[in-house]
Design a protein with these regions (language model features):
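Conserved structural core of kinase catalytic domains
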Residues: 161-233
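ATP-binding glycine-rich phosphate-binding loop
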Residues: 56-114
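Compositionally biased low-complexity segments enriched in polar/charged residues
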Residues: 1-13, 54, 58, 62, ...
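Conserved kinase catalytic-core helix
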Residues: 151, 227-259, 264, 274
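Helical subdomain adjoining the active site within ATP-dependent kinase catalytic cores
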Residues: 11-49, 320, 329-430
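ATP-binding glycine-rich loop module of kinase domains
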Residues: 104-164
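Catalytic activation segment of kinase domains across protein kinase-like and atypical kinase folds
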Residues: 256-336
């Protein structure tokens, strides 16, 4: 059940500025950055992204520092006061395995029309010996913040729009969120489990708060389930290009980057306007040390990858979860494998619990199915059984070998599925 949990006043001048910005539809990166600056205003919450610095090295944690409060200036703040400063209402959306999502809603001066949204992710800190103190930068809750900060510079530098931009983060007391269930403002089984675990002393008394952009189209899995019957070949091609291109951009800078949980419900969807003319985007990608251009249709949505609490870049963003003994069994480790995320997305997409109708669905073009089979051949899509001696894949779809069967750059350069997006025989459009 979704219920509004807070209602705050907001300065009329700020509302008018937001309305003016909303008319730009947030399709462009500059508009997204302007929104973050406007939302933060002059409150005490620091921006996670320094928009005046445009290099990833600026935020790489290459020192021996382990305290997130010093590396990112993550403060302890009063949640209610901070949200009051930002303004608007909060609406509970859902609970996942590791976090709980709220939607921030800012209304117009009359309080009737919704003009802007932001996302709030609330994450409890499990008490585990190998995770350390709540301020340890290697904890998965803090590693996610570090990863978002590093990757955000690919967006700031206009190399890709396909990453959720973080806004701010802080620690706060867990008690206001415990009270939500008590007051029946939130009614959800996973949220109830969160309350139960806290009462059993499995969580610290603080929670981590992440404020970020809001994606207005839900997640990609729901989008596909709701729209697959009317999706054309160009729609599938564009979606897959967006996903593969953002992995390519990241891996070209950080070949050791691994998301480790890149499934369709960890990819968010932003609805964007369809233009009447020139309804294409020009992607300028550096592949094999040269620039290649791709003309990508605007299909009315833009994906953004999200949920980085399992992610790592060895030597830059370390993650205690990735370094755990149990993750070795599912081949999640701080070792370069540019195929891992690619495989996990496409393999899980067609599995039970996701979109198993994919292979038998007559509405899906045969070229789309062939492309997925090119990325995940049958020997790497087989689900293990007790009698299966060739165990390449876990029963949840994770590949168990570290061979880079293929990788994003190779696919964009060579796979004929994307030939229509290559505008000319030349490498780049001047």
């Amino acid at each position: 059940m979704n219920k509004q949990v807070k209602n705050n006043d907001i300065d009329n001048n700020k509302i008018n500025a937001i309305i003016e910005l909303k008319n730009k539809k947030f399709d462009g990166i500059n508009d997204r950055i302007e929104f973050i600056k406007l939302l933060l205003g002059d409150n005490n919450l620091n921006s996670m992204v320094d928009f005046d610095m445009c290099d990833t090295e600026h935020v790489e944690n290459r020192t021996n520092g382990f305290d997130i409060r010093k590396i990112m200036e993550k403060k302890y703040m009063d949640f209610n006061k901070l949200i009051c400063d930002i303004g608007g209402k909060l609406l509970y959306i859902k609970s996942g395995t590791t976090g709980h999502t709220f939607k921030g809603i800012i209304y117009d001066n009359d309080g009737t029309s919704e003009i802007l949204n932001y996302a709030i992710k609330v994450v409890a800190y499990p008490i585990r010996e190998n995770y350390g103190d709540v301020n340890d930068v290697k904890r998965p809750e803090n590693a996610e913040l570090m990863m978002l900060r590093v990757l955000s510079y690919f967006v700031v530098n206009a190399q890709t729009p396909h990453i959720v931009l973080p806004i701010g983060t802080f620690n706060t007391s867990i008690k206001p969120f415990i009270a939500l269930a008590k007051n029946k403002i939130v009614e959800n089984k996973k949220y109830d489990q969160f309350i139960k675990r806290y009462k059993q002393s499995e969580y610290h008394d603080d929670v981590s708060i992440l404020i970020s952009e809001w994606a207005n189209g839900g997640d990609l899995l729901d989008y596909i389930k709701n729209n697959y019957k009317k999706m054309k070949l160009r729609d599938w091609r564009t979606l897959f290009f967006q996903i593969i291109s953002v992995l390519c951009v990241i891996q070209n800078k950080y070949p050791g980057f691994r998301h480790n949980d890149l499934k369709a419900n960890n990819i968010l969807v932003q609805n964007i306007d369809l233009r009447k003319k020139n309804n294409y985007y020009l992607y300028k990608l550096h592949l094999a040390n040269e620039r290649y251009d791709f003309l990508v249709p605007n299909i009315g949505i833009q994906i953004k990858i999200w949920d980085f609490d399992f992610a790592c870049i060895p030597g830059i963003v370390e993650n205690s979860k990735v370094n755990s003994d149990w993750t070795d069994k599912i081949n999640v480790k701080p070792v370069q494998n540019r195929y891992y995320d690619l495989h996990y997305f496409f393999n899980t997409l067609t599995m039970k619990g996701f979109f198993p109708e994919f292979w038998d669905c007559k509405e899906i073009h045969h070229q789309v199915k062939q492309f997925v089979r090119d990325i995940v051949p049958e020997q790497y899509s087989k689900v293990n059984t007790d009698s299966n001696e060739n165990q390449f894949v876990t029963n949840r779809g994770r590949i168990l070998i570290n061979t880079e069967y293929t990788y994003p750059e190779k696919i964009l350069l060579e796979n004929p599925f994307f030939n229509k997006m290559r505008p000319t025989a030349a490498k780049a459009i001047d």
